[in-house]
Amino acid sequence: MMLQNIKNRLDVVAVLLVIISVGLIQSSTVLGGDQSLFVVIAQLLDSGKTLYKDLFDYKQPGIFLFYLLAGKTFGWSDIGIHLFELGYWILFSLILFSCIRNYSLFRADYFNSLLPLFIIGAYYGNATIFHLTQLEALINFPLFLIVWLLDRAYKTESGLFVTYLVIGVLIGIVLLSKLVFSPIIFFFLLIHFIFTLKSKDIKYIFVKQIIPLCIGFVIPLSVFLSYIFIHQIENLIVDIYFKIPTSVIALEDQVDPDRLLSSLKWFIKKMLVLLLLAVLGVFLITKKESHFFSLIIAWGVIGFLVILMQKTSWWSYHFQLLYVPIGVFAAVGLDFVLYHFLQKVKPSTPLIKSFLIVTIVSLVFFNQMNTLWKGANSQNNTRKYSFDYARDDAAKIIQVIKKEDSIFICGNPRMYVLSSHLPELSTNGWILEYYLDYQWDEFYNEFKNKPPTYLFVKNDYDKLIESKHVKLWELMMKEYSEFDSVENGKWYKRI
């Protein structure tokens, strides 16, 4: 028994070391445009500015709070943000180690320790500048906690009130991170209540489950509502959460089937072996864990539909929402394959058995290891992991900009971070293609009343601005002269 415990601990340590290693390799990756925007908004919040009012964005507050915590913990640098994320994944790994052993998922006990590799290891192995520290990846942690706690509540009646209270809090956190995840939550609860009805009545569900769940949900919701009312942004929240999304979805010029196809190709290419193993794993569901597996299947199916719903996006990072369901079933599938392979081969010593296991697991993650290896050893490494085109574009401005100057970026918000000048206009120059007509009018009025010292317009945004609001473009060309032409756009200085 003691020998088995030591072996289990060695497995856990080995997996943690792998995750820490790949996380540290990825920590040198520069922040992409989306992630830089999150940093900018988090820095604005840290300086006392108001969410949405001082810099507009469509996203719910969860991701901004994550970046705020990251920045306050390890600093606002690329490495600081990524190290905070690595700590987040280490915590998730420890939770997986702790709770997954209570299930009967695998024939071989060591797969309980390997599971984080199928989720977090796959994520780090696949991720590029566009995928790291995106919400769709980060949300896997609280979603898994909801699944685990729902399953725990289904199997035991001890501490039900606290369990459902925590589930409610987690649901609030998920929905305050992205409302579009609500169908996943709905089906989690629907499946859970259906299973519960097999042995309990409606009164039990209402009193023991729904009431504490609602109380828990109200906790994060009330905090956010208090913030809304204190800062008097009620109308803005209604627009951002309900009115604008329906209008943005109707922007047919932003629906790009080729982008969806490209994202699917990227994900399938990276995850092909794991996807095949996951398909096998689905057919190996045990009746004993039918509640848990039903929730995981719902996550995968409804999660994929949620991705398809976002037709004006369809970015490849959206598919990171599926890492847990694919990872769990892929681990179940590989456990089955390895079990029967080892039964047939019958290795003569534990050393040979361990060698075979490590070799096969390594082959399963060949795509991920190959991507990491190419990135870490490429002669053009700056283009792979740490190429910072925004730094090149902003190089001249960084040298000449004064403390009292202001800038506005119609392009990558990373240049705000690099120049140490936060935006003074509420218009979000990173998502102008999603702006509605009335927002262009607001942009014009804001720009006219508070013109920045320097203006950057990325390639193609000049045509976009001119086509969406001629008066705004004419104002820019009248009030500004070209200061610098760079690879990805042009800098202008106010005359």
How should these model regions be labeled?
Residues F84-Y88, F118, G125-L150, F161, ...:
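Multi-pass, polyprenyl lipid-linked donor-dependent membrane glycosyltransferases
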Residues L94, K269-F304, A330:
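Hydrophobic, aromatic-rich transmembrane alpha-helices
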Residues P183, L305, T312-V345:
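Hydrophobic/aromatic-rich transmembrane helices and adjacent perimembrane loops
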Residues F186, L190, W373-N377, R383-L436, ...:
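Short periplasmic/luminal acceptor-recognition loop of GT-C membrane glycosyltransferases, typified by
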Residues L197-K200, V207-K288, K311:
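Transmembrane-lumen/periplasm boundary regions of multi-pass, lipid-linked membrane glycan transferases
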Residues R101-N102, L138, F144-V166, K200, ...:
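Membrane-interface transmembrane helices that cradle and orient dolichyl/undecaprenyl
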Residues L83-F106, I120, L145:
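Transmembrane-helix motifs of polytopic, lipid-linked glycan transferases
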Residues V162-L179, I185-L190, I219, I302-M309:
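Membrane-interface alpha helices of multi-pass inner-membrane proteins
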